[in-house]
Amino acid sequence: MIKTPRPRLCRRVGFQPGTTYFKPAGIRMTELKESVLLVDEFEAVRLKDLLGLEQEECAVKMRISQPTFHRLILSARRKIADAIVNGKAIRIEGGNYKIRAIKRLGWRHGKRV
C-alpha cells in the first residue's frame, strides 16, 4: 500500500496584494533573478510583522496550526531576506489559499444590523 501525503488545507487570507512585483532599482529585467513569495506567505508577514499579532492569533485567522504558521513565516522571511541581500525581485503569486469573507452590514427584519 502506497502512503499518500495528507492534502494541504486551504489557508485563509484577509488581504489580496495590489502590487505583486517588487524590483530593485538599477538592475535590468533581463539580468534579474526572482524570489516567489506565495500569497499565504505574504499574509503571514502582514499579520505578524505589519499588524504585530501573536503567532497563535495569526494561525487562528489563517485557519492553520501554530507550527504550520511558524514554518510559513520562516519561509517568507527567508525569501524576502534572499531577495534584499542578493538583489532579486520579489513576485507575489500562487499558494493554497482562499480570501477570507468580509463581514458587511446587513438588514434584518427591516432594521440595519
Question: Language-model segments: which ranges?
Answer:
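Helix-turn-helix/homeodomain-like alpha-helical modules used for DNA recognition
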Residues: 98-113
